[in-house]
């Protein structure tokens, strides 16, 4: 009897102990829940929240690389089309008239940023990338069927670059949401895609056109672009959730009321007036000076191969000593190279060396410019402000190549005036970048800006 009573007491004690443990667990859970309610929500815009690495962040970089390979990489090979159209497909038209195709591509690429940047802020990158993929591939397919100047102008000069703008802007903007300390390096890697595209596409078309003809060369290029853009659509995402807000004129004008943003924009506009002229005319100029066409066909790939390093190495250095410092130096470097090598070049060697050095110097412009804007912008408005920057650059991009064509016509097919203009206008742009850099960080050369 005593033994039975003892067992009952032990069981009762166990039940009480178990109940006490459950009560404590419930109390702890309630306290944790209360703490979680009281804890402030995570702010994705806080500098400490930027991953600056990890699989997800670097997969966005990989997708952005593919996107710029297909968008700006295509733009970087405009020189081979200028030469081909002048000598064959559109040989009945003047150099200045043909250059409007490339100018429209650049204009729409940059002007699209005015709309695409704001749409990105409101809805994110997904639908923009899908629309851009369709328009770019469709435009190239239509160009493969074109036989008249106006048809190529509509397909390659308008339809395709609408898609390119929708591919370029979201890729650049998304990088800024994943990286802060390594933003220059990440932007440089993404921008390197445009350099590699500028290497692959000219060589590919130089080989394909004689073998399968212009129409099928364009179709093969379009299929390659479609494959890479599928990867971009699957990987390019923003870390920051979209913020649907009404668009007002004040939002578009606000950035230009900031002194540093305005000075940076003016400097970039001036620099762009000369930036693309060597890319567009170096191949035609080399053939005019007696370079074998089979060798001249490799000038654009050489230029873009060098820009691969110009987009990555300066971006890495910019993270260490400041993007404005590096960007300004590279702009001066490009201008000096134009004066020192392109202007006096009259044989193969200096033209080839110029292509390599100018590719390295000018490659940093597109790679670091978004980093400059991100540095002086609220991350919540990164899409609008980068879009506004590139949108304004559409104006000098539109007139740049026709101005170069007018100089060529003035020199009766020569390129001296065009070369002098390139050196002078890029030097002026570089000087204005110095002014913008001083506006942000003062005159000290040792300060990281």
Swiss-Prot record:
CDD domains: MFS_MCT_SLC16. Keywords: Cell membrane, Glycoprotein, Membrane, Transmembrane, Transmembrane helix, Transport. It is found in: Cell membrane. Glycans are attached at residue 233. Residues 1-37 have a biased composition (Basic and acidic residues). Residues 1-43 are annotated as: Disordered. It is a multi-pass membrane protein. This is MFS-type transporter 1. It comes from Ophiocordyceps sp. (strain BCC 1869) (Entomopathogenic fungus). The gene is MFS1.
């Amino acid at each position: 009897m005593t033994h039975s009573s003892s067992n009952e007491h032990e069981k009762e004690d166990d039940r009480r102990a178990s109940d006490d443990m459950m009560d404590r667990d419930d109390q702890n859970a309630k306290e944790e829940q209360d703490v979680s309610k009281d804890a402030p929500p995570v702010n994705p815009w806080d500098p400490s929240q930027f991953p600056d690495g990890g699989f997800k962040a670097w997969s966005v970089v990989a997708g952005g690389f593919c996107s710029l390979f297909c968008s700006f990489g295509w733009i970087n090979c405009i020189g081979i089309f200028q030469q081909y159209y002048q000598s064959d497909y559109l040989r009945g038209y003047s150099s200045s008239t043909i250059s409007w195709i490339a100018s429209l591509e650049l204009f729409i690429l940059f002007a699209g940023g005015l709309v695409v940047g704001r749409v990105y802020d409101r809805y994110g990158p997904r639908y923009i990338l899908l629309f851009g993929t369709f328009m770019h591939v469709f435009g190239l397919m239509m160009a493969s069927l074109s036989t008249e100047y106006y048809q190529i102008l509509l397909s390659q000069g308008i339809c395709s670059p609408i898609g390119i703008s929708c591919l370029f802007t979201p890729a650049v903007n998304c990088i800024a949401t994943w990286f802060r300390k390594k933003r220059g390096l990440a932007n440089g890697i993404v921008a390197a895609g445009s350099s590699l595209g500028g290497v692959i596409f000219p060589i590919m078309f130089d080989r394909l056109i004689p073998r399968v003809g212009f129409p099928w060369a364009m179709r093969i290029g379009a299929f390659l672009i479609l494959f890479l853009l599928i990867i971009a659509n699957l990987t390019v995402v923003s870390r920051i959730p979209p913020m649907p807000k009404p668009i007002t004129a004040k939002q578009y004008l606000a950035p230009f009321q900031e002194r540093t943003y305005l000075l940076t924009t003016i400097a970039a506009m001036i620099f762009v007036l000369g930036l693309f002229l060597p890319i567009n005319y170096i191949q035609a100029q080399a053939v005019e000076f007696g370079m074998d066409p089979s060798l001249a066909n490799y000038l654009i790939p050489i230029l873009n191969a060098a820009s691969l390093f110009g987009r990555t190495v300066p971006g890495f250095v910019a993270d260490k000593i400041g993007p404005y410092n590096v960007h300004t130096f590279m702009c001066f470097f490009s201008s000096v190279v134009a004066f020192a090598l392109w202007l006096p070049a009259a044989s193969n060697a200096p033209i080839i060396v110029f292509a390599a050095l100018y590719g390295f110097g000018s490659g940093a412009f597109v790679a670091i410019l978004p980093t400059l804007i991100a540095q002086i912008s609220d991350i919540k408005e990164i899409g609008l402000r980068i879009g506004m920057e590139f949108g304004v650059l559409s104006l000098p991009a539109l007139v740049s190549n026709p101005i170069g064509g007018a100089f060529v016509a003035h020199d009766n097919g020569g390129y001296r005036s065009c070369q002098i203009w390139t050196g002078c206008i890029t030097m002026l742009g570089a000087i204005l970048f110095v002014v913008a850099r001083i506006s942000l960080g003062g005159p000290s050369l040792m300060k990281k800006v």
